Amino acid sequence: MKQRSAYIVLTRIHFGDTVLGPVLFKRLFFERALLWVAFFMGSIFANNVCAQKVYDFNATCVQAYTEVNKLKIAPATALIAKAKQQNPQNLIPVLLDAYTDFYVLFLLENPADYKFRFKNFERTIEALEEGPKNNPLYNYCLSNVYIHRAMVSLKFGHFWDAGWDIRRSFMLADENHKKFPAFTGDDLLYGALQGIVGTVPKGYQWLTNLLGMRGSQKEGMKMVANFANGTDVWAKLFSPESHFIYPYLLFHLQNEKDAALAFIKDKKLDLVNNHLHAWTAANLALNHKASSQTKSIIENRNKSADYVSLPFWDFELGCAKLYALDLDGATPLLTKYTEQFKGNFYIKDALQKLSWANFLKGDMRAAEAARKQIFLRGGTDTDADKQALKEAKLGVWPNPLLLKARLLTDGGYAKEALALLQGKQQQFTNPLDKLEYVYRIGRIYEDLGKETEAIAFYKETIKLGANQTAYFAARAALQAGQILEKRGQKQEAISFYEQCLAMEEHSYKNSLDQRAKA
């Protein structure tokens, strides 16, 4: 009876004034159990649906993407935060976070920023890996973050890490093209990587092949060109990047400098309110002897505090003024760059230019002080920095006349440079000055479109300087090769390129060799 009574007690459930018996209890318990299971399973399903990561380039994300690629980092960051609130499962704001980290670290090179921002890349990668792999944006996003991290690693001297990240980026983009052939969103990055890998000399291609990276400069550039000029949804969305990357590749990889600047002009890029495009145009113009154009772009840009403050504005505007022999205008700008820029790139080059400006002004105390700093500050990753250090080690000040001609030529003032040098060859008795004089005249004639005269002076430069460590002979060989290649005289051009490659121990060897190989 005890056992029976216990059972009755356990099964007597009061519902209002009604007493439910064992049979009805069992039925009610069963129904409630089913409801509980259904609720539990429904909750799991609902949670899974809510937790499903998505890639949504909604209006807020598009606006944030546009702002960050104008280098308006603070407004972009606010929009990214807003997008995360709108949909915490959206991975596009996570990707855009990496853009802010990339631009700040790559352009400013501040070690203090590096300490807390660089580790964000790993967190971003981990977050993006939670996305659905059956979406082409999965590989696209990861490939972008890896290449961004690689570029930052290169700037901070972590070359091994950068190499592995470049491979990761390449492999993800390559896999995407095979898996989703209709997806064009990563044509820009994949094409750029293909083009760069395609420039690797044949003697080293075994290494890229071993790493699974095979590329073609021609096919890669074709892919990038099609994307930069494309009209599909991805080409339009990512045009802020393609209009930055494509002209750079045209200029430096293809050596099509006029085409690069023409692209910027034809696309009517906003060089006032988009600082990324303004920086691109100013930099390429400066490197194409159009320093007056550089000066105009920098001085007329939107100076709102919304934009990240780039020290390179001071450096490039200082260079542009120096090339015009505006020494008083150049000095404070170059000084500001060397004092405020936290990175290493172009510091030695800027200090050399600062020393030249003071030297030409007759302020030898300031000139010597700037030269001494070349030994103490900055890196030697760029050819310009290497050359600055090499010339500082010589301990000799350049011939003032040749220096002025050099600066005028670099700035695009060829007529003024020719007027300065013409008929004065006999004034130069030093062998190195004689070599530079012949080279400078060759460059001036080329800039003036007198190619036959230029080639004659380039040949004389090679004859005088082939066995010297100065870069003049190697550069003369490269310039002669480029003139002949444009004329269709390919075999003669190849001969000059081979001469350029054969010359050792000059400061611009890396960049000149790259151009000769291309």
Model features per residue range: what roles?
Residues 83-88, 179, 209-214, 229-233, ...:
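Solenoid-like repeat scaffolds
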Residues 55-59, 67, 71-79, 97-248, ...:
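Short coil/linker segments at helix-helix boundaries
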Residues 244, 251, 286, 402-412, ...:
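Alpha-helical adaptor scaffolds
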Residues 65, 99, 144, 151, ...:
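Residue-level recognition of tetratricopeptide repeat
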Residues 54-60, 135-136, 183-184, 202, ...:
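Generic helix N-cap/helix-start motif at coil->alpha-helix transitions
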Residues 62, 96, 103, 141, ...:
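"A position-specific structural signal for the A-helix of alpha-solenoid helical repeats
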Residues 71, 157, 254-255, 289, ...:
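Residue-level detector of the short coil/turn that links helix A to helix B
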Residues 79-80, 115-129, 161-172, 212-228, ...:
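Alpha-helical repeat scaffolds
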